[in-house]
Amino acid sequence: MSADTCDWQNFSPGDLSYAFPMISSGDVSASIARSSQAFPTWAALSLEERRGLLSQCGDNLRAKSEEIAVLITRETGKPIREARLEMAAAIAKFDFTFADGERFLRDEAVAGGPHPALVRHCPRGPAAVISPFNFPVHLGHGATLAYLLAGNTVLFKPSPMAANVGLVYAQVMQAALPAGVFELVQGWAPVGQELCLDPVVRAVCFTGSVPVGKALSVALASDYSKSLALELGGKNTAIICEDADLALAADAVADGMCLTAGQRCNATSRVLLHRSIADRFLDLLQSSLKRYRPADPLDETTLLGPLIHFSAHERYEQLISGSEGEWIVPGGILECNDKEQHGFYVLPAVVLVNDSAALDASPLAKCETFAPILVVEIFDKEPEAITRHEAWAFGLTASIFTSCDDAFSRIGALLSVGNLYRNLPTTFSPSTLPFGGWGNSGNGRPGGRSFLRFAVQEQAVQWKA
């Protein structure tokens, strides 16, 4: 750390380290001022004009796709095959967002009143997008596109744990957009706080932890006209019914808990398992998990990369040392692992818990794990599974594994989640649909046309014929 830079060491010390410029309060204010100055001109463009400029951004991103994918892997440890999928999803968001904007952002005629009327969807102003490290392009990019297409300007703050990715992404966007329309703001939490609390910023999209999301809600409570979209993660559950395809369920659970080393808001961190098929399912799960052996994330065959940082590695070790139940897959670090040289690689871990009260009081229940750790609980009857699911305060995703249509409908109707799946991993989240949670998982919907609702404010227009 120097007076002018903030040093960051990535997941594999000695491989990629860098220093990004420290942002002063004056720098943040200057970025906000440029964003505010650019807003009226950008908002005055037609939808077609904004879409045309954003299409150029899409062309730029496509041209840089492989370069950015490799950078994502080197900077965060995400396996290269996942990083490429992230870039493909980000590029696909252009067409999805354009199609949704065409349907939703046009003036809407409303009949049946005393006068001719329409609803106009108006931009809010400068918008802050706070992006996480685990999907350093894809997650912030979806909100960014929606805000920009709707006529807002964007102040983009990437995670400092993926600052290089954020820089290249910003360069791609800025190359096609007028000055001030897309501003890059690098820095740690105080920078994000200043950005979000500035009264000139009229919308905030934050992806991150529950404590920070709640703190933002409290801090912005008095500025009730500011739009706040929160995507705060989850404790995502797979419910395995007695008639489930167990091989399919085991592979889906293994994928859900291990993709991105469990560092996904929608990662599978819990299984509710019917007693009659428990032994068979757990045997299949252990076999499926053998696919996920930590290895070099730049290797095309690697499925499980490292955790992002030493602090995440330490937290993983603390969690698997708990006494909540029987660790049927014990997890741990690689025997050859040297934290100072080879990165923060860990093994998948599975704990079978019989004492639900002890579990509910433990960090395994109260906090996002953000590591490949799975809690398994046994149930005998459907109502018991539903009660146990609803005992936890998160509500992002859940998946029900059953061959019965009625069982899926019956159980699913009683689960408080924003995303419900059948016979799919909890990590399944196509960009065509709203993505977001209930309860502690937030209020944002950064997917499908739903996020456009956060990007605009409605104006009812009537006139005397």
Task: Please give the residue ranges for each predicted region.
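Conserved C-terminal structural/oligomerization subdomain of aldehyde/semialdehyde dehydrogenase
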Residues: 12-19, 201, 338-341, 345-465
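ALDH superfamily catalytic-core signature
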Residues: 211-360, 422
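Short, well-ordered beta-strand elements within core beta-sheets of diverse protein domains
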Residues: 18-23, 38-44, 129, 238-241, ...
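Hydrophobic packing residues within well-ordered alpha-helices of enzyme cores
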Residues: 94, 166-169, 173, 195, ...
